[in-house]
Regions:
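Conserved activation segment of eukaryotic-like protein kinases, specifically the C-terminal portion
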Residues: 220-234
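Conserved short submotifs of the Hanks-type protein kinase catalytic core
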Residues: 136-150, 154
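Activation-segment/catalytic-loop signature of the eukaryotic protein kinase fold
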Residues: 131-132
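Protein kinase catalytic-loop region centered on the HRD/HxD motif
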Residues: 173-185
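Activation segment signature within eukaryotic-like protein kinase domains
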Residues: 169-170
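AlphaC helix of the eukaryotic protein kinase fold
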Residues: 85-119
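Conserved end of the kinase activation segment
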Residues: 234-244
Length: 262
């Protein structure tokens, strides 16, 4: 099945480079262990370029073939526990006992905790989840694609922002974070690359793929998530208990980084 869509922006094209975004896969060095561009998932999602990656997942731009709309696709890819041969789709899980346990439990935890995100679908400043499924020995979350640039990308261009400008970003983000907590969830991955600034001046909290249901195990999670410089101490230990304080710390660290560049 062939689709005349740019793997960078998913607009219709006749050839590369893309006249809309300039993307050309022939001149871009991709991530070797990522899904090949052009992969079809669940029979209905076209996979494009990598948007970002973290300790437990890879996010791709995608196209919903049936509904004809752009989406973001998050793949469960726990660093240090799996590998993928270049050009292939399936994952190879390492043979250690720890990795085998992750294979059995990790994808289910990923999907179970992702389902909790449906609780916050009505929060305007949080990206919506559209689909969940398993394939290629792993799991996937399909989310709305949010146009714009991340706070991280903005700061790379502008440098630190004054508070008068930064508060227009953080006040809505903090209010959205509070609503997430009221729904019984903690995000656990607040950082400059998970705050999206849209062309119309709004802010969206991205990537609730690490979200934790606070009603389960007193906030403890078997999915360890940490981001240097932004995650609090409890996220660096498997016995750490996450709560609203986890996101408060990460949001405060993000504010500090935005104001100082450090």
């Amino acid at each position: 099945m062939k689709f005349n869509r740019c793997f960078g922006c998913m607009e219709e094209i006749q050839g590369y480079p893309c006249p809309h975004c300039g993307f050309d896969p022939r001149s871009v060095k991709g991530i070797e262990y990522a899904l090949p561009m052009g992969t079809i998932l669940a029979g209905k999602y076209l996979v494009g370029r990598v948007l970002g990656q973290g300790g437990f997942g890879i996010t791709y731009v995608g196209w919903d073939i049936a509904l004809e709309r752009k989406v973001a696709i998050k793949e469960y890819y726990p660093s240090g526990q799996v590998s993928r041969n270049p050009g292939s789709r399936g994952l190879t899980w390492y043979t250690s006992v720890q990795s085998q346990q992750a294979k059995q439990n990790g994808t289910q935890i990923f999907l179970k905790e992702a389902r909790k995100m449906s609780k916050v679908d009505d929060i305007p400043n949080v990206v919506r989840v559209r689909d969940l499924f398993q394939e290629n020995e792993t799991a996937y979350i399909v989310m709305d694609f949010v146009e714009g640039e991340t706070l991280k990308a903005r700061l790379e261009k502008t440098g630190p922002l004054p508070w008068e400008q930064a508060k227009g970003i953080f006040l809505p983000a903090i209010q959205a974070m509070e609503q997430v907590h009221q729904a019984g969830l903690v995000h656990r991955d607040i950082s400059p690359d998970n705050l999206m600034l849209t062309p119309d001046g709004k802010v969206k909290i991205l990537d609730l793929g690490a979200a934790k249901d606070l009603s389960v195990n007193n906030g403890a999670s078997s999915m360890q998530v940490a981001k240097g410089g932004f995650s609090p101490f409890e996220q660096y230990t498997q016995r750490g208990s996450s709560g609203p304080w986890t996101d408060v710390y990460a949001m405060a660290a993000t504010v500090y980084y935005t104001l100082t560049g450090k």
